[in-house]
Regions:
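The conserved Walker
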Residues: 457, 469
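A short helix-turn-beta junction within AAA+ P-loop NTPase domains corresponding to the substrate/partner-engaging
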Residues: 509-512, 703-717
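Conserved lysine of the Walker
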Residues: 473
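Hydrophobic anchor at the beta1->P-loop junction of P-loop NTPases
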Residues: 465
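Post-Walker A helix-loop "phosphate-sensing" segment adjacent to the P-loop in P-loop NTPases
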Residues: 482-492, 507
Length: 825
């Protein structure tokens, strides 16, 4: 038995090994304890608090209770939540200098703020009745030898086979039990730890001020883990704290609990602006043992409901006093109610709850403990800081240390489940497993927990963004496009209002501004000699001919194909739209005339095609949005899509972005192409990201809606207070699958800051706050665009940095443009 009192003396610095309950590895995924117990440790993903509302959390708490209730009296289950500062940022070397600049500025802002991550672990401990375990001492006796050597030394003895057989059977039964629990709770994301990861996690739970050791802790050459894992001592020379390694720890215990609990009662700790550890343990009692303890408890409270003075008075006078302690009587009633629960086969056990704060100095630990105390008091708990029992309380909060806790209490499993920290704030994936690179970006949240965002969920990266004008669609599209350059991709951006022009200039990309009065220098007929070019040209010319209401019949299509074959045989300088005027039958030639010599001649009747797609290509579409240009959009999109399709390769990541896609969605050709893209482009390492201000444009097109719901892995909803109507609520919830909680976040979020991201396993209200160094590059007003073009004329790889400084100072255009003309001349 460990004498914990001696560690309260000043300046004692004993080895931690004597305090740890662990002894050796019984299996790669099982730790043997000093009291002969066996311990398995799991890392827990947890259930996201924003993804699931209170109804689901209550339901899952019942599921968790059902999964655990079959464990029985030999089991102890413990949960550990460790909230740690998170300094990880998804760094990568950008080839694009402007994307690197944006990332550096954004990283400075993100890391300037404190961010945290919640780590959750569960330990399961199985302890046999001690009378059955005496035989193990023959094998596990501490004499400095490896267990394998010890077993080998008993090779001629009968007990060796008995010991190994007994151990294997215990391990088999334990694993079977734990596998059943893990399978019944898939949303918890239980990951059984073993070998190096098991040791690293155990060390982390013991000394949480230290960071979790990535890559694990190497397995020892000898068996005794208590000595192997402790490279520091305990310093008890504090009244209400202990020092491990270089950190000072304070332990908080609960001395009184609220009358009512509910699942997630302690979720306030998940967003606390401090590092902390929260642990709770539950040791199952047999029904007989629980009933015996309850009877003793009831008898104690019933007897003490009257003070000694009143009891003496009753004895002396023979009259019963009516002065009864109401608190004690309430405890009597609570105990009677608990006994009724026990009769209903609801498990009871001995529970303990601890909270641990730390810092480099005692004052820092005290600040954290005060914050924890505030959260607990708000929920009706009374807490105290451990002093005399600080060491036993601290080491009771490690797997296997539950028996050391000085403040345990009996409680039903159902009530204990309310304390369990199975709810958390998921951080997303730090790594994009599909692209084999760091995550796209780290977004901040109100929980002070970064969310690592990726378009991809598994191998699907298609994304839709819904939000009204002014809610921040263009900002997030341009920011994510700049961040996507970390993967060295091709970017095709269909812009609507010049928001992407400055960034495309800074990327040394191509910006194509389609205007009715300007010649486009597009020549779709130049594709006639390419693979699949004739088939494309047949469909393209059919759209041109039918654009004024004519419907081509089979004979027309035959004549069109003949004309295509004939033009294909002509010299390349004759591969122009005008060549079809003299080859097609007169009726078809007349229908084609507006595109050759008439109103729309600037678009496709050009001697050469000068559209040389770049790594970063922007198509500005706003000037084609008028009714007079409605006939231009279908054939123009057809040609641009054909050029984009021909550039795609599974070897090069590609992102196609469509801002204000309602403009394109109103045309059947685009809607059909979008459905095709969503179904097929993932095989070509390509994702489509489209934004629209109106959900109805998607919802009213049943084929498009079905494709979005089936093939789009990421949906981003921007704040929209105008959506707080019955019809809009129905659209968000019943059509696009938001929960009541998620819809509430949409109508109450802050425009141009909050973005509700909904993916397969997580919903997160992320925040994107960009400083002026970045927003300067996403401006669409004439001043900013002229300023950027003028400064770019001066030359230099990093001209955009000068532009940002001039933009922030609002330098007059005349000063910059006059100087730029000097550089050009």
């Amino acid at each position: 038995m460990i004498d914990l009192k001696k560690y309260t003396k000043a300046n004692l610095k004993p080895s931690v090994s004597e305090l740890l309950p662990i002894f050796s590895l019984a299996n790669p995924d099982v730790i043997r304890l000093k009291d002969e117990g066996l311990c398995a440790l799991y890392k827990v993903r947890g259930i996201d608090s924003e993804t699931f509302g209170s109804d689901f959390i209550s339901y899952y708490a019942d599921r968790l209770e059902d999964a655990l209730k079959g464990l029985g009296e030999n089991w102890t289950v413990s949960f550990f939540l460790i909230r740690k500062r998170n300094y990880y940022y998804p760094d990568i070397e950008f080839k694009s200098s402007v994307s690197k600049y944006i990332d550096e500025k954004y990283k400075e802002r993100v890391l300037r703020n404190k961010n945290y991550v919640n780590n959750i672990y569960i330990s399961f401990i199985y302890r046999e009745n001690r009378s059955k375990l005496k035989i193990f001492k023959k094998v596990f006796e501490r004499d400095g030898k490896k267990i394998t050597e010890k077993v080998k030394s008993l090779s001629e003895k009968k007990t060796k086979e008995d010991v190994i057989k007994e151990l294997k059977e215990r391990l088999r039964l334990i694993n079977k039990e734990l596998e059943g629990i893990a399978e019944s709770l898939p949303k918890l994301g239980l990951e059984r730890l073993k070998d190096e990861e098991l040791l690293a996690a155990y060390y982390f739970v013991v000394n949480p001020a230290q960071d979790l050791r990535q890559g694990g802790i190497r397995l020892p050459d000898y068996a005794f883990l208590d000595e192997y894992l402790t490279d520091f001592t305990v310093d008890a020379d504090y009244e209400e704290a202990i020092k491990l390694d270089s950190s000072v720890y304070k332990v908080l215990s609960v001395k009184d609990y609220p009358q009512e609990t509910y699942p997630g009662v302690l979720d306030g700790l998940l967003s606390l602006d401090k590092e902390l550890k929260f642990s709770c343990s539950f040791s199952f009692l047999s029904k007989e043992k629980a009933k015996s303890l309850m009877k003793k408890r009831r008898r104690h409270y019933f007897v003490t409901r009257k003070s000694l003075l009143h009891q003496a008075s009753e004895t002396a006078t023979g009259e019963e006093t009516k002065l009864i302690d109401p608190t004690k009587m309430s405890y009597v009633y609570d105990t009677e109610e608990a006994m009724q629960e026990l009769d209903l086969v609801r498990p009871f056990g001995i529970a303990s709850v601890n909270f641990i704060a730390w810092g480099k100095a005692e004052k820092e630990a005290e600040e954290t403990s005060a914050k924890i105390t505030g959260v607990l008091k708000d929920r009706g708990y009374q807490v105290l800081t451990e002093s005399l029992n600080k060491i036993s309380a601290y080491f009771s909060a490690v797997p296997g240390g539950d028996k050391l806790n000085p403040r345990s209490f009996m409680v039903s499993l159902g009530n204990f489940v309310d304390y369990i920290p199975f709810r958390t704030i998921l951080i997303g994936d730090k790594f994009n497993f599909y692209l084999k690179a760091p995550a796209l970006c780290a977004l901040e949240t109100k929980h002070k927990t970064l969310f690592y965002f990726n378009f991809h969920v598994k191998d699907v990266g298609h994304t839709v963004i819904f939000g009204p004008t002014g809610a921040g669609k263009s900002v997030i599209l341009n920011f994510l496009a700049a961040q996507y350059m970390k993967y060295d991709p091709q970017v095709y951006f269909f812009d609507f209002g010049y928001t992407a022009e400055i960034l495309s200039l800074a990327q040394n990309g191509l910006h194509v501004d389609f205007k009715p009065e300007k010649r486009t220098y597009l020549n779709p007929v130049s594709l006639i000699s390419k693979k699949g070019g004739k088939s494309f040209l047949r469909d393209f010319l059919q759209v041109l001919i039918e654009s004024f209401g004519y419907s081509m019949d089979d004979e027309d299509l035959k004549q069109l194909w003949k004309a295509i074959e004939l033009v294909a045989s002509l010299p390349k300088n004759k591969h122009v739209l005008e060549s079809f005027s003299s080859i097609l039958p007169q009726n078809l030639s007349d229908k084609l005339r507006p595109w050759v010599t008439g109103e729309y001649k600037n678009y496709f009747n050009n001697p050469v095609d000068m559209l040389n797609l770049s790594k970063y290509t922007v198509f500005e579409m706003k000037n084609l949005s008028g009714a007079n240009n409605s006939k231009v959009i279908p054939p123009l999109l057809m040609y641009l899509f054909e050029r984009i399709d021909s550039s795609l390769s599974s070897l090069i990541p590609t992102i196609i972005i469509l801002d204000e896609s309602w403009f394109e969605l109103q045309h059947p050709i685009f809607a059909g192409k979008m459905q095709e893209w969503l179904q097929t482009l993932r095989k070509l390492n390509t994702i489509v990201v489209f934004a629209t201000q109106d959900l109805m444009h998607v919802a009213e097109n049943q084929r498009m809606l079905s494709s979005v719901l089936t093939n789009v892995s990421t949906k981003i909803f921007l704040p929209n207070y105008k959506a707080d109507t019955t019809d809009m609520k129905n659209l968000y919830i019943n059509t696009f699958g938001l929960t009541e909680n998620e819809f509430e976040m949409v109508i109450t979020g802050t425009p141009a800051r909050d973005y509700l991201i909904k993916q397969e396993h997580v919903t997160r209200m992320a925040q994107l706050s960009l400083d002026e160094n970045i927003t300067a590059l996403i401006q669409s007003d004439e001043y900013a665009r002229r300023l950027a073009k003028a400064i770019k004329l001066r030359g230099g790889d990093d001209w955009f940095k000068d532009y940002v400084e001039h933009f922030k100072k609002r330098t007059p255009l005349k000063e910059v443009e006059d100087l730029s003309e000097y550089f050009v001349n």
